[in-house]
Swiss-Prot record:
Residues 9-238 form the PABS domain. This is Polyamine aminopropyltransferase. S-methyl-5'-thioadenosine binds at Q33, E108, D140, G141, P165. The active site is at D158 (proton acceptor). Its main location: cytoplasm. It comes from Shigella boydii serotype 18 (strain CDC 3083-94 / BS512). Pathway: Amine and polyamine biosynthesis; spermidine biosynthesis; spermidine from putrescine: step 1/1.
Length: 288
């Protein structure tokens, strides 16, 4: 039997992961980017950009459930949600499951990303693009948060790593804009990489966010294809009580929501804010 082609991730120089490629569904390599979607027997459809896995059908639910349900249930009565990025539609899918949310705005810099993902990753959006509460805005995320007249209860930054096009979503200009259009007691969250390998990302985000929010921290989860340990999510708000809600309060909100999740549950919610000592020490050692 012929040996299967392998795709190797290039995120780190000294080690990494590979996937057997059963079938290439799409591959575009230009001077600006290298985008591929292929099928793998273990992880389903895999999308990678510039040599780095962005999402897989098998484990995306962990990332998207934790990015949405943690801030939305901590807030408790979010009506207006902003998603920056998220063109694959999975973040939108999870937000639409909250029936008390009245409007969902998604800002994507490239309209082609949405149509592309609708075609090649239909399980990610699961029809959520057709939700009547959803509005798509084609714009740069930094520009939008600094110019919009809308305000939001929860802002979710579904950004790539802080290199290339995703770098602007880790800047002070972006964080300042998010603070500008966030309602009182609103919550901002963003992915911040695998902290064991990308600790400087967390430190940098913590330092910048602390200029604009009184309560800044992280919560975490483990996602198989984002290897190297736990992935951290930045958390920023001016209501410090929201990060310390009891499991009983979250449980009551969870039951009232009617959510049925594959990863998230109220115990996971409260436990996610417990961080490893090496990250706590790194954050504490930074000048204020």
């Amino acid at each position: 039997m012929a040996e299967k082609k392998q795709w190797h991730e290039t995120l780190h120089d000294q080690f990494g992961q590979y996937f057997a490629v059963d079938n290439v569904l799409y591959h575009e390599k230009t001077d600006h980017q290298d985008l591929i979607i292929f099928e793998n027997a273990a992880f389903g459809r895999v999308m990678a950009l510039d040599g780095v896995v962005q999402t897989t059908e098998r484990d995306e639910f962990i990332y998207h459930e934790m990015m949405t349900h943690v801030p939305l249930l901590a807030h408790g009565h979010a009506k207006h949600v902003l998603i920056i990025g998220g063109g694959d539609g999975a973040m939108l899918r999870e937000v639409t499951r909250h029936k008390n949310v009245e409007s969902i705005t998604m800002v994507e810099i490239d309209a082609g990303v949405v149509s592309f993902c609708r075609q090649y990753l239909p399980n990610h959006n699961a029809g959520s693009y057709d939700d009547p509460r959803f509005k798509l805005v084609i714009d740069d995320g930094v520009n939008f948060v600094n110019q919009t007249s809308q305000t939001f209860d929860v802002i979710i930054s579904d950004c790539t790593d802080p290199i290339g096009p995703g770098e602007s979503l880790f800047t002070s200009a972006f964080y300042e804009g998010c603070k500008r259009c966030l309602n009182p007691s609103g919550i901002f969250v963003a992915q911040n990489g695998v902290c064991f390998l990308q600790q400087e990302e967390a430190i940098d985000s913590h330092r910048k966010l602390s200029h604009y929010f009184s309560d800044v921290g992280f919560y975490q989860t483990a996602i198989p294809t984002y290897y190297g340990g736990i992935m951290t999510f930045a958390w920023a708000t001016d209501n410090d009580a929201l990060r310390h809600l009891s499991t009983e309060i979250i449980q009551a909100r969870f039951l009232a929501s009617g959510l049925k999740c594959r990863y998230y549950n109220p115990a996971i919610h409260t436990a996610a804010f417990a961080l490893p000592q090496y990250l706590q020490d790194a954050l504490a050692s930074q000048p204020s």
